[in-house]
């Protein structure tokens, strides 16, 4: 057992981590799922926000059970993370939970991993197949602007811990063109701009903000992109390591960036792709 693992076990046994909470937006699948479980194993309790129908709710329940099995607490909210009223309700619930925990209870890690948007070309035939103004604005708001809204609400509610780490999931679509990905690509560019601005404005509070650019990963979100099977085949053929990125790869990187020694890493887009991007793209 390495020194870090022993230190974490000591912290759990002595109660040092009892007030450490992470907030994961998009907690029930893909990157959000993997990061929720990894953070729990590293000593964080988890607030999870997800949007699931009855058919997919069992997976969210399984994640909660895995967090509990790691000896951590989990509070999951099945709501639309992009809805202003629902966001306020979740923040209020977090505040109530923290008030009953300890005076030190704050959110010390936040992950923005929302993958809800419109995948349509700008110029479709017929015109009805082209993306609309409403769809474009919705995609950018959900996948980009909501990072700011959630961070603001936590900050002004006094729930963002000094020294907190904020992460946002981006993709190579921020600089590579994929069919029907234009709105999401725009949202990722907006998201990365917000990461830079938040990093500067929150620096006096010792809060770091970074975007994680994952390589092509076989997630439910990827499966919605037109041509995803061909994309997977191309990446597997050209990747220097011969495989796709996995959610576990991203979760491991996120937990590593939560270490004390990584506090000075802020305002960056960090590639978590095993060299995929530099090896020739997609």
Model segments located where?
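Short C-terminal tail/terminal secondary-structure segment
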Residues: 2-10, 255, 266-282
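Conserved mid-core alpha-helix of short-chain dehydrogenase/reductase
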Residues: 86-89, 138-141, 145-153, 196, ...
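Catalytic loop of short-chain dehydrogenase/reductase
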Residues: 115-204, 216-217, 278
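Conserved SDR Rossmann-fold cofactor-binding beta-strand/turn motif
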Residues: 208-218, 258, 271-273
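A conserved structural motif in NAD(P)-dependent oxidoreductases
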Residues: 239-250, 261
